[in-house]
Amino acid sequence: MSSSSSHFSSTAADLLAVFSSDNKDKSANKRISALKKAIAGISYGYDMSSLFPSVISSMESNNLELKKLCYLYLKIYASVKPTEAKRAVKLILNDIYSSNPMIRSLALRTLTSVNIKNFWVAAMDPIVRLLDDTDPYVRKTAAIGIAKLYSYDKKMVESSGLIDHLKEMLSDESSVVVANSLAALMNIVNSSTGFKLTFSREISNKLVKSLTDCSEWLQVAILDALIFYVPQKPGEAESFAERISPWLQHGNAAVCMGAVKVILYLTNYMKDDNRVKEYFMKTQPPLVTLLARKSSATQYVILRNIQIILEQCPEMFANDIHFFYCNFDDPIYVKLEKLDILTKIADIHNLDQILPEFVEYASEIDVELVRKSVKCIGYLAIKIEERKNDCIDSLIELMNTKVTYVIQEAVIVIRDILRKYPGSYKSLVPILYENLDSLDEPDAKSAVIWILGQYAEEIEDSITLLNDYLKGFFDEPLEIQLTLLTAVIKVFLKKPTAAADMVTNVLQWCTDEVNDPDLRDRGIIYSRMLSANPELAKKVILANMPPVNVGTGMYDPDTTEQLMLNISTLSSIYHKPPNRFVKGAQVAYCEPSPVLRLRTRDSNPSNTDSRESNHKKYNHFHQKSQTRRVMEQYDRNSWNPSPFSDESNSNTFSGKFDSADQENLGMPMTPETHLMD
């Protein structure tokens, strides 16, 4: 370390000695060598800021290589020594008027890269002039400089009209200038909440023409920007999609995915259902090609994007399921994504191929893969009603292996199956009895407790089994305590005489002895509901819920649309719209047009209807509000002293049930599911 320190110390000394030379032209090569060593020292973490005055004085040289090194040094240390850096502004402005286009471009790039007010204020006038420079390289640098200035001071750029200049540059004769102007414009759009961008057909055609003359990075920028083109007439979207199609075969994954995004975006403006499906299917081969690459990271990204696309076209891979079979050398995160996709594309026709795969995966060594496979089998039983018996038989077969984590995951999915098909598979309950001792995870125990409460009237030992779980009530996690409380109340509503002592103890524990506010509040709510009106309590606690549904649609249409417009971005990996994890990000949506295609909730391209997601969200909230109002009625209007409360109207349940209470609660109901899981 000491030898290295002395080396960079000597470099600084050499540089100072070179600058003190009277003949600057003869010492140019030495200064270049010394500056390279100084910048190398900076990369190793050494402080070279003491050379700042000497470097600034060297900027007057006409040597291009020396200027590049001086400008690089300036960009590194300008923020460290802003006062001294201001001296360099005049020298940079002199270079902007140089006859050499490389020097003009280099000077402007430096002036817009330093986040010091004197620098970017000084850049405002030159950048307007250089936007019309005769050299395309200088114009390209000026376009990128506008985006940099916008990141420093948005109001200054917006008021100066530079953004309008940037839009005009989309008609530049140079494809490189057009692509870089577009990249700068997109950068501004993505960092602004009030800036709206749309492209005319003429501009969009020019952008497509420039694709062939651009680098891969600029091709990606152009393809990302083409979603701001809004077709206005029938046939425009199809014609435009055909022009983009050749880039589906591009070797660069980012370019290929950019083309996929544009084509799928254009399907929103196609009226013919068959053409829509045709273009969805046209994107399948490039996706499969990318999926076949050896890079696991690339595979993961493609799989995450395919999941989003399947929201719009579930049948896209229905006949090509083998692409998503797990390979022995796939990392676990790739295998899990493949299982999700297989579950999505499964139907009555391909289940004979998918179900054996899941059963095989459930016999693997990897515990996470086994759990996911068992869960997927349960989802298939819910999704494909015609073949539910085959899926349930596979679950029973797996439970017979007596592998603990298999049993626990199977119990969880059996709960969902019972909710989906109430009254159809009660024969599964005895199988659960045989494996109760194997359940030690909270989710599995909660599932069994839910079943005991939901089917208490059909399970003879339900009270005994619940009492066994109640012995360790205070040692259980909150999730199980809440489930136990709800299950005990449901058992009491169905078997009031036998469960009276049990419900008394549990409500007393929850209202008097526990510290968790959620558990205590729920106990108080149940106590008030039972004391106010037992019959209404039945209607709330034993109310029917919407049946469990495991379909293709994971998201509402608005979210799906936003994800489709953000394919091949970080949003497609998170499966969240950008505005949910990036502050100030714009919400993407399809612009209105006479040919805009309207979708239904299932987002299937073969169906059309109006976008009613907001209305459906309101209806869903309205349903919950009705339940909330019923509970408020108990809390505010129907609270009267009863055997369930003491004379001071306390919030605790402290008394025994008399015969009248038991008689009132003696008629059990048989609901499809319960309310407060």
From Swiss-Prot:
Superkingdom to which the source organism belongs: Eukaryota
Stretch list, region Disordered: 597-677
GO cellular component: AP-2 adaptor complex; cell cortex of cell tip; cell division site; cytosol; mitotic spindle pole body; nucleus
Pfam family, any one: Adaptin_N
Signal peptide start and end residues: none
InterPro entries (alphabetical): AP_beta, AP_complex_bsu_1_2_4, ARM-like, ARM-type_fold, Clathrin/coatomer_adapt-like_N
One GO MF term: clathrin binding
Membrane-related topology note: Peripheral membrane protein
UniProt main location, coarse: membrane
Keywords, ordered alphabetically: Cell membrane, Coated pit, Endocytosis, Membrane, Protein transport, Transport
UniProt feature, compositional bias: Basic residues: 616-627
Disulfide bridge positions per record: none
GO biological process: clathrin-dependent endocytosis; intracellular protein transport
Family: Belongs to the adaptor complexes large subunit family.
UniProt subunit comment: Adaptor protein complex 2 (AP-2) is a heterotetramer composed of two large adaptins (alpha-type subunit apl3 and beta-type subunit apl1), a medium chain (mu-type subunit apm4) and a small adaptin (sigma-type subunit aps2).
Name of the protein in its database record: AP-2 complex subunit beta
Source species: Schizosaccharomyces pombe (strain 972 / ATCC 24843) (Fission yeast)
Lineage, uppermost ranks: Eukaryota, Fungi, Dikarya, Ascomycota, Taphrinomycotina
